[in-house]
């Protein structure tokens, strides 16, 4: 779709504002749930990555979160000070830093199992609607990332 069309310029009619304000609302909905776990939203996303695949590099985590390593490093330091992860330098290449779950980090996964269900209830939407929305958003993100790579 390369055709240019005139779009409304009011705030409430902007796709970007709908996405931005929904993201803020979603993050706020997570806050009281994650407070019980002692995690912030970015820390929770990081832990989700580690629960999927332990012993990953800082660079890999940053890529999955669409952040740079400099942004992820302080987040990881806080998780380490909480006892959920440990940072280990690579044996073959000391520039690489691997992130590993501690026993506390593994145990935290059990406590976090209820988080998705609580958020699902907060949305008051059907599973089908939310799965379709997630798929549509992932497709939009991919299209935008492709666009950004060209420019």
Tell where the protein language model's regions lie, with residue ranges.
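C-terminal regulatory/oligomerization modules of transcriptional regulators
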Residues: 1-7, 103, 125-151
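N-terminal helix-turn-helix DNA-binding core of bacterial DNA-binding proteins
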Residues: 17-20, 24-68
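Alpha-helical linker/hinge and terminal dimerization helices associated
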Residues: 22, 26-29, 65, 108-126, ...
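Short helix-coil-helix linker/hinge
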Residues: 37-42, 71, 102, 126-128
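Residues within helix-turn-helix
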Residues: 58-59, 70, 77, 97
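Charged, amphipathic alpha-helical coiled-coil/dimerization segments
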Residues: 77-135
């Amino acid at each position: 779709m390369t055709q240019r069309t005139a779009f409304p310029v009011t705030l409430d009619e902007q796709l970007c504002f709908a996405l931005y304000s929904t993201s803020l609302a979603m993050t706020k909905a997570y806050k009281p749930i994650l407070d019980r776990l002692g995690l912030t939203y970015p820390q929770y996303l990081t832990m989700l990555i580690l629960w999927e695949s332990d012993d990953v590099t800082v660079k890999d985590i940053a890529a999955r979160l669409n952040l740079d390593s400099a942004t992820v490093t302080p987040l990881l330091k806080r998780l380490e000070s909480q006892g959920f992860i440990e940072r280990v330098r690579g044996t073959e290449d000391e520039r690489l830093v691997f992130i590993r779950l501690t026993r506390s980090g593994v145990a935290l996964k059990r406590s976090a199992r209820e988080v998705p269900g609580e958020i699902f209830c907060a949305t008051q939407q059907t599973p089908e609607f939310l799965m379709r929305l997630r798929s549509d958003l992932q497709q939009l993100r991919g299209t935008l990332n492709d666009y950004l790579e060209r420019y």
